Design a protein with these regions (language model features):
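Extracytoplasmic catalytic/substrate-binding loops of multi-pass membrane glycan-assembly enzymes
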Residues: 34-48, 58-70, 78-83
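Transmembrane-embedded, aromatic-rich helix segments that form part
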Residues: 163-167, 173, 178-192
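Loop-to-helix entry region of an early transmembrane alpha helix in multi-pass inner-membrane enzymes
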Residues: 64, 68, 78-97, 113-116, ...
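Start-transfer (signal-anchor) and selected internal transmembrane alpha helices
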Residues: 1-30
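Short helix- or helix-capping micro-motifs
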Residues: 23-26, 115-124, 169, 173, ...
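Membrane-interface transmembrane helices that cradle and orient dolichyl/undecaprenyl
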Residues: 110, 146-164, 190-191
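Transmembrane-helix motifs of polytopic, lipid-linked glycan transferases
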Residues: 86-107, 145-149
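Short acidic/glycine- and proline-prone juxtamembrane loop motifs at membrane-interface regions
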Residues: 128-138
Length: 192
């Protein structure tokens, strides 16, 4: 190791130099801002507080997974803006992290970071998800996870990745029924 590469090698081991650290930090900042902004609930948040009073196999037109996850958060933190915000922004951090991992299958670290970070430019993720969305965030995270696993399978097929892809697709369908479009598109792409 030369003197010119020593700082670079050291900095690559520091946690704050990794993109996943920043995705988590931004999500925690969003949680803090949501808690400071208002104790009032948005439409989807109020719906979750109502639905998480009991476990069911479905909630209105929505499949159950998001509400089950929210129920678990409420068991730990109580039915609160904190519990709602931690789940939502935790799933957003997971979404960006899974897209980063998918990007790493095709790009270098910098390219994968920008592929993931650029998702904030889509109004559905960059604005509406922070304001008031629930199931859409979960299905987007599962779509990013499925994309990452499919890319891993294409490059290095392993039984574990196939099992994980099946699990993620199952979670996607339990998160929002529109995941069927993602699964169908992935199947068509894999067959071509």
């Amino acid at each position: 190791m030369t003197a010119s590469t020593a700082p670079r090698a050291l900095s690559s081991r520091l946690p704050w130099t990794h993109p996943l650290f920043w995705f988590a930090a931004i999500s925690l900042a969003h949680v803090a801002m949501r808690l400071l902004a208002s104790p009032a609930l948005k439409w989807d948040e109020a719906e979750q507080i109502l639905w998480t009073q009991e476990l069911a196999l479905g909630y209105g037109p929505q499949p159950p997974l998001y509400t089950w996850l929210q129920w678990a958060m409420n068991q730990v933190f109580g039915p609160s803006v904190l519990a709602l915000s931690l789940l939502k922004h935790g799933l957003l951090a997971l979404t960006y992290s899974l897209m980063y991992l998918a990007g790493r299958e095709l790009l270098d670290e910098r390219g994968a970071f920008w592929a993931s970070a650029s998702m904030v430019l889509m109004p559905a993720l960059g604005w509406y998800s922070v304001r008031d969305q629930t199931h859409t965030i979960l299905v987007t995270a599962m779509a990013c996870g499925a994309w990452w696993l499919l890319l891993r399978i294409v490059r290095r097929p392993r039984p574990l990745d196939f099992a994980l892809l099946g699990l993620v697709c199952g979670f996607g369908m339990l998160g929002k029924y529109s995941f069927a479009l993602v699964a169908g598109a992935m199947l068509l792409a894999a067959l071509s």
